[in-house]
């Protein structure tokens, strides 16, 4: 059976994206497939990496949110102009991405990026 193109690409990109979801334990792969299939998330498939994009709607702002990115960091950084173009075409006001602590060093070197907030988490299982 021939799979739709998005499904074929998502399957190919699983090796790049799954580690992100495994690290935070927020979604399993079936959740990822369902959100892409339903059009909630959009796959930006690159040769050696991938990103999942979500559009967030606030009362006064529309945000392109990079939910997950994995694979070649160099390739992801080079895709910045593509992400900007997607955001502009969808009339977004800004782009947001969460990253590992080390990503702050990379973002500081890129034009236009600034640190918005710091997130902390605590498992209630440990309390």
Predicted features along the sequence, with ranges:
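Short intrinsically disordered terminal tails
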Residues: 1, 125-127
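Short amphipathic alpha-helix that is part of the acyltransferase structural core
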Residues: 1-27
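Active-site rim helix/loop that mediates acceptor-substrate recognition in acyltransferases
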Residues: 21-40
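Conserved donor-binding loop and adjoining core beta-sheet/short helix segment
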Residues: 37-74
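Short secondary-structure junctions
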Residues: 42, 109-116
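Short glycine/proline-enriched coil/turn segments at helix->beta-strand junctions
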Residues: 45-49, 89-92, 114
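Acyl-donor binding region in acyl/amide transferases
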Residues: 61-110
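Conserved catalytic-core motifs of GNAT/GCN5-like acyltransferases
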Residues: 114-125
């Amino acid at each position: 059976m021939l799979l739709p193109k998005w499904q074929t690409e998502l399957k190919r990109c699983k090796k790049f994206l799954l580690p992100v979801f495994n690290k935070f334990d927020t979604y399993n792969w079936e959740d990822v497939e369902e959100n892409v299939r339903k059009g909630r998330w959009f796959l930006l498939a690159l040769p050696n990496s991938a990103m999942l994009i979500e559009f967030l709607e606030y009362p006064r702002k529309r945000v392109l949110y990079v939910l997950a990115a994995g694979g070649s960091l160099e390739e992801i950084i080079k895709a910045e102009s593509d992400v900007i173009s997607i955001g502009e075409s969808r009339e977004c006001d800004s782009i947001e991405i969460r990253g590992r602590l080390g990503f702050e060093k990379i973002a500081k070197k890129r034009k236009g990026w600034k640190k918005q907030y710091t997130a902390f988490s605590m498992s209630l299982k440990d309390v």
